[in-house]
Amino acid sequence: NLSPDHIGPGEHKTFEEYRSWKGQLFRRCDVGVVNIDDENTEALLEGHTCKLVTYGRSEKADYRAEGCELLRTHDFLGVAFHVSGRDNMDVRVNMPGEFSVYNALAALAVGKVLGLPDAAIHEGLGKCVVKGRVELVPISKKFTILLDYAHNEVSTESLLTTLRAYHPHRLVVVFGCGGNRSKLRRYGMGETCAKMADFSILTEDNNRFEKIEDILADIRVGMNKGNPDAKFVEIPDRLDALHYAVDHAQEGDLIAVIGKGHETYRDREGVKTPFLERELLEEYAQQIGLE
């Protein structure tokens, strides 16, 4: 997959430059496993020298997903589908949505290239949980809350599109943006959440050496562009924001806490202190006697 990330000061100057460098991978490997549905795949593979294995929803894919079904309970979000093409297999994945289908297909294709038996691939996909990637924190039967590393416009839009497909009562997002990073991420995430979430809780996410007030001001610019009537609240301290999300959750809500995912720290003024969102949510739920 390829999307317009890692562009800005200290990274790549343009998307074209980023794509060019990433395309070098397919001139330096024996086998390339690629998403045939990605609009950038053709340009990415220009001049490739490796053998290609493709996956996707397209009829042309070597490993193709069909009959996708979304699955949800208060403590489970997942998807089931059938794989056809070079294989014939029913798959159930403990992670939700379209992007999980693509991730599972990619893993399956790599497994086949490496010669893994179908039984091992099937079992692995069924048990797979990626820490900080649509990671459910089952603290209540009333609502669903999850952690995800989405930290730019593209990944946020993909995640919210996925979660919206499960038809929650409200889609609530808790997010911030990193300090000393491109402001484009702040504008983009703000705009996306304003358009796609029912309610947003703006907070910190590794401020580093920037003031949280300045970061939130940039996010507001994106929010106002995306939807001037968007409903949101600003809570600078991320722990307070987590507590607010739990305290104000409604029956059937789906709450996405995004940006940090698997990270275990909070960075303020270059000082990193422990901050494990899963543990903090579990401790708070126990503290208030949440059911």
Question: Can you describe what each PLM-predicted range is?
Answer:
Residues 1-47:
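Flexible active-site lid/hinge loop adjacent to a nucleotide/diphosphate
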Residues 1-10, 42-90, 123, 128-133, ...:
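Extended acidic/charged loop-beta regions that coordinate divalent cations
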Residues 99-100, 114:
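A conserved FAD-binding loop/helix module that cradles the flavin
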Residues 91-98:
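A short glycine-threonine-serine/GTX helix/turn-capping micro-motif
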Residues 49, 86, 106-119, 123, ...:
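ATP-dependent carboxylate-amine ligase
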Residues 36-40, 57-58, 262:
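Short, polar loop motifs at secondary-structure junctions
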